[in-house]
């Protein structure tokens, strides 16, 4: 039997149990003990305001429930950090405008190294890095030069190997099987009509292109084997007043099926059965540009192949204003949503004021004491993990 890869399942292995200040059970029963992987906190990558050098990282600690605002300014993450990937004690942060991958120490959030993508790949190939993931000892990232670059996670050096993909690549993910891993890349073409998915067979370096008229502007992608779940931003009306056909789509064996209408944000968690990862829990928000409707939220279980509405409750006075990022704690299953703040002068969402984030259970109930401020324009949410010993 082939062992199919779940692209995000490689980040966290182990039990779904979490012990922390926001846990439901703090008891110590004594007796035997075992080690489990737990979520120690979460970080938010904040774009900042373009041209203002105020991109930053916000860290929320699960134990203390305290927040730190980190790495802001030109000496930090600079202008427009866009994505991040955690591997062990290291966070790799993508600096799009800076043409840099920032290597950050997870323990003290100091910058260990700045890796220039244009120096490592070439001016034309390495400009504007966008998204990042990892597999084995390699860190993979996309660039608007139309390439996927590779960093050695141990030596923190740029590989000479790079893969030519489609136009304006965004998110990427690892799928296939353990014996034949495949890197899938979402090529957006900036929404101009020539979008595609690149399929890179890592053992040979062969690059194939997948095209379908329903794939118009793919932004994020996750895989179970060779089954793909694609967040697509669709297209805009001629006057750019409205966004149309955005959504979460399922691709397999040449067929594209819509799953969540109007979805514009995606977070990826795990589905567990008997402490075994069996699929994804995909959290989405639907807030297409120009829509007069309030944002909606959904969960999609890839194991049961079912969609559930996520109705947010219990957050009176700190309701989500304009969702900007969503994530699922892969161990506990809580949903984290980052939002823009409301401008007190205009009453509209602000792109220049600090945002905020809330945590909710998978049934949509606000988790007490988890409302915290972020930097300007929160864009991506990641998690940090540690190992704990529990007694029972």
Q: Where are the language model's segments positioned?
A:
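Bacterial Sec-dependent N-terminal signal peptides
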Residues: 1-42
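Conserved beta-strand positions in repeat-built beta-propeller and related beta-rich domains
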Residues: 44-52, 93-97, 141-145, 183-192, ...
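Blade-loop segments of beta-propeller domains
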Residues: 68-133
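Repeated scaffold domains used in trafficking and secretory/extracellular systems
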Residues: 78-86, 123-134, 167-176, 214-225, ...
């Amino acid at each position: 039997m082939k062992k199919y890869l779940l692209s995000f399942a490689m980040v966290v292995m182990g039990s779904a149990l979490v012990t922390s200040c926001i846990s439901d059970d703090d008891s110590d029963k004594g007796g035997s003990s075992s080690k489990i992987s737990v979520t120690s906190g979460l970080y938010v990558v904040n774009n900042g305001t373009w041209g203002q050098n105020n991109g930053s990282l916000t860290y929320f600690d699960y134990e203390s429930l305290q927040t730190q605002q980190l790495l802001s300014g030109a000496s930090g993450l600079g202008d427009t950090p866009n994505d991040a990937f955690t591997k062990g004690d290291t966070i790799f942060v993508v600096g799009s405008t800076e043409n840099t991958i920032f290597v950050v120490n997870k323990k003290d959030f100091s910058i260990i190294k700045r890796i220039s993508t244009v120096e490592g790949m070439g001016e034309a190939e390495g400009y504007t890095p966008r998204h990042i993931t990892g597999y084995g000892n390699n860190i993979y990232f996309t660039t608007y030069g139309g390439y996927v670059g590779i960093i050695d996670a141990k030596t923190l050096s740029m590989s000479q190997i790079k893969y030519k993909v489609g136009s304006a690549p965004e998110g990427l993910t690892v799928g296939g099987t353990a014996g034949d891993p495949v890197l899938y890349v979402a090529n957006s073409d900036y929404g101009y009509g020539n979008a595609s998915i690149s399929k890179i067979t890592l053992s040979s370096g062969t690059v194939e292109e997948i095209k379908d008229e329903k794939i118009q502007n793919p932004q994020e992608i996750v895989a179970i084997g060779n089954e793909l779940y694609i967040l697509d931003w669709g297209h805009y009306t001629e006057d750019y007043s409205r966004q149309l056909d955005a959504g979460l789509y399922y691709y397999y064996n040449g067929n594209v099926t819509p799953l969540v209408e109007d979805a514009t944000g995606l977070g990826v968690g795990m589905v567990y059965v008997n402490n075994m990862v069996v699929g994804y829990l995909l959290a989405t928000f639907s807030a297409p540009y120009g829509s007069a409707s309030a944002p909606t939220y959904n969960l999609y279980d890839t194991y049961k192949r079912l969609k559930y509405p996520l109705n947010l409750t219990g957050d009176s006075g700190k309701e989500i204003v304009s969702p900007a990022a969503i994530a699922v704690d892969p161990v506990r299953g809580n949903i984290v949503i980052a939002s823009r703040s409301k401008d007190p002068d205009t009453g509209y969402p602000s792109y220049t004021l600090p945002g905020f984030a809330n945590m909710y259970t998978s049934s949509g109930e606000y988790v007490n004491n988890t409302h915290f401020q972020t930097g300007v324009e929160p864009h991506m949410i990641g998690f940090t993990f540690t190992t704990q010993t529990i007694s029972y």
